[in-house]
Each structure stands twice: as structure tokens, then as C-alpha cells.
Amino acid sequence: MPLEIIAMEQVKMMANKLWGGRFDKAADGEMYSFLSSENVALDTALIAYDIEGSLAHVCMLAKQGIIAKKEAGEILSALAAVQKKAGEGKFSLDPALEDVHTNVEAAVTAITANGKKMHTARSRNDQVSLDTRMYMRVAINEVSAALLELQASLLELSKKDCVFPTYTHTQVAQPASLLFWCHAHHCEIERDLERLSQLYARVNECPLGSGAVAGTTWNIDRNYTAKLLGFSAPTANPMDSVGSRGELEAELLSHLYLAMAHASKIATDVILLANKRLIVLPDEYSTGSSMMPQKKNPDPFELVRGKASRMLGLYVHAAGLLKSVPSGYNLDSQESKYALLQGVKTAEQSFSILAHALPLLKFDKEEIVLELEKGYACATELADLLAKKGVPFRSAHSVAGGIVKECIAKKKFLSALSASEVSAVAGVKITDAELKEAVSVDKVARFSAAYKIPAASAHAKALEARVKALDAAHALLEKEVKALVK
Ligand code: ARG
């Protein structure tokens, strides 16, 4: 995504042809560059959607008799020519034309003068809202696919199941298993996917026909354009449609932030456990030091964590645009495009990197057992064993705490205790087998039996259905366009 400000020392313009009727002087070059140079760079991501939206709009204008079928046919074939050029990457946006909407209209009008009729009954305000919703639908689907890939990589990783530590307050807590850890993160991502699915339904309403703010008195058919573009329905209120630009973007970024926070948690666990030498980092996803030859650094994992912070910034940026603006359309909302495009790219890259790196992790089981032993990770099990023998839990907790204190002083692990020692301190009879069962850190099955990662998330099906619906709409639009282009 090209984000650089295009150098435009001075864009000297005649009073703009698009809206210049009531102006005497040309727009100031610096002002124009401020408005448009970054904007057209961002709008490049919207070209395909803008053209598709125009195809549907023109089909509707013809169907409603607002323009003649012959005129529509000419506009549609000009749009198809621009679409082809854009598909080949040969359609670049001119900042002097402000945005993608005007660039497309100008390109069409250069092919056929009927292009001047294309903008009947719409505004760039409903157009940009349409384009960004269409972009967001694809983005939500692509990010969901990346999250599903991350879930699949957790499933893959869980096949290396072994005993695994858990922590609270970054201190060793209780033993668990690698599967248990993978399952926990799988659950987090399931919620991320659910949030995205729910948002998709809100995004999937068509604002086209809302006009600048108050709709239009032309006899348009909003249901028809909504259908041609694969939306579930038209939006309900024109002022809300143009005025809520940025809201869905902020919502998406907030969901992406939560998903990035989950990715960051996974990455941080990997960093910390590699630091303790329990995890061996894959060569393919680590870097070295330019000075210290022995180093193997978890750079991509750190960068995922760093990018979670960027995502929070992008969310705050988009959310901030929503307050203090009055009803209707305001150009402040143009700023949400930057946050949206950056956020989607950042999320996709981060989830993909993690998905590829995780299955390559290796585990040092001896070190893991040592970590758990050193952390007296089975002390809760020991207290529970005493409680099961009739000692009130609070007293059992105290006895087990005393045993841990003693062990620390004697530099001894819980697994080295004898049943007679424990029985004597606790005042209840414990057998060797019972004690062993309680204080063995490596009973993997015990920690894995209850957790199963599903082979396919329910959200994979929902994603498939959404993609299918978009494909079907594409086919329908193509059919309608063909009927008019002779
Ligand atoms: N570039 C604008 C945006 O992204 C498109 C709508 C412009 N509308 C206007 N009245 N200036 O929001």
C-alpha cells in the first residue's frame, strides 16, 4: 500500500470541473495536495470496489429509466475498460482529481461523453461509504482466513503434546500440557472470529443511494443495487449511512486490536519460554546479532507484540474521529481510511507469521520438568491429596506450604519426598502411590484429556458462505452488465 505523500509542490488547477461551477478562483495547490495526495494513494486499494459499485449503479439507472439503455451500455463498457486497466495495475490515480471516484468518472468520460451521466442520483459520500464497506467485507474475510490458519497451526502444534508449565504473575503455577496451552489460544481466536462474523453482518448493508446526506428524489432502486453488490439489504437512513462512516472501521479495528492482543500473548509466551530455554526457536523465524555471535533472537515474535501496539493506535485514531463531528458527512471521516488499510494489513501479516512459525517450535521436555519441579508446581496437588484424606483444605494448604518451605531450605523437589515423611507432617496416612500420583509433574494425559481442539472451526463454514455469496453477486452483476453492453 503506497502511503507516501506524493510530492505536489503546487497543483495549479483551474476551478475544479467536478464541483467548480460556483467558484471563481482555482483551488490553492498546497490545500489540494493536503486534501488529496495521500488520499489517492490510499484510494488505490478501493479502485476495484469503486468500479464495481459504478457498474451496479449504472445498471440501476438504466433499469429505472433514469438514463437510456444505450447510454448505460456505453458507460458500462467504458467502466469495463477502466476495470481491465486497473486489473493490470495500469490505472494510477491523479491527485489533481481528488479521489478514486472522480478518477474513475474522468477515465470513463474520456472514453464516452455519457460518462457525465454516471453520477446521477449519487454522491461521493455514499460512494466512499460503499467502497469502504466492500473493502471491509473482503478484509474481514481475509483476516478471518488468516485467523483460521492460526487456529490450524495451534492444532498442528498441539500434536507435539508434552507437559507444559502454566504461570500466574509470571511465577510457575501448575503443570498442564502443550495441548492445554494451544486450546486456550484457540478459544481466544474463536471469539475473535465470532466478533468478525457479527461485524460482517453490520458491514454488509448497502449505503449506495444515500446520496450526499438526504437521499435523492430520483426514482432509484436501492434493493436492486444492494442485490447486485451482494449486500443483505440497503441501509435504512441516508444521513446515518454517510454519517456512520468510520464507525464500522473503528469497530473492525477494535476487534483487530483484541485479536492482536491475543497474538501478542502467544508471541510473549514464546519469547519468555525461549528465554527459559523450554522452547527452542525455529531458525527460520529467529534472527542473530550483528555483534554477539551466540545470539538467537525472537524478532518476529517481538514484532507481532509491537504491532499490537500499533493496532491500538490505529483503533484510537479511528475512534477519535467519531466524536465532535456533527450529523451528516464530514471530511474528517476520510482519515479513517488510513487506519483501516494499515490495520488490516498489519493484522493479516502478523497472524500469518505466527501461523507459520508456531508449528516449527521445539520443546525441551527435561527443562520443562525442571522448571515445574523448581517452581513446586505440584504443591496444590499435594494440598488436595491431604484434603481428600480429610484434612480441611485451609489446614492442608498450610501443611503443604510448610513442606514447600522445608524443601526450598533443603534444595529438594517435591518428587523426592517420601510418603512416610508427608504422612508424619500431615497427620494422615498417605501411600507411596498416592504421593507419586500427586507430585509427578509429567502426567501429560491428566492435563490433556479434557481438551480437544476441533479440526474445523464453525466460523470456517460461515466464511465459506460469505465468500460464496460474494461470488454469486459478482456473477449476477456480470450478467446484468452483459445484458446492457451490446
Ligand atoms: N475522499 C472522500 C473520502 O474519502 C470522498 C468523499 C468526498 N466527499 C466530499 N464531499 N468531499 O471521504
Residue ranges, per PLM feature:
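A short structural micro-motif
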Residues: S77-K85, G243-G246, G402-C407
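Helix N-cap/coil-helix junction residues
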Residues: I66-I67, F231, V391, K412
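Charged/polar positions within long, soluble alpha-helices
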Residues: C59, K63, K84-F91, T109, ...
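Charged, flexible cofactor/metal-binding loops and thiol motifs
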Residues: R133-A139, S144-A145, K159, P165, ...
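Glycine-rich cofactor/substrate-binding loops
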Residues: Q10-G53, N114, R277, M292-K486
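A helix-coil-helix interface module used to build multimeric assemblies
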Residues: E9-G215, I220-A226, G288, L417-F447
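Short, well-ordered beta-strand elements within core beta-sheets of diverse protein domains
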Residues: C59-I67, F180, A250-L258, E381-G390
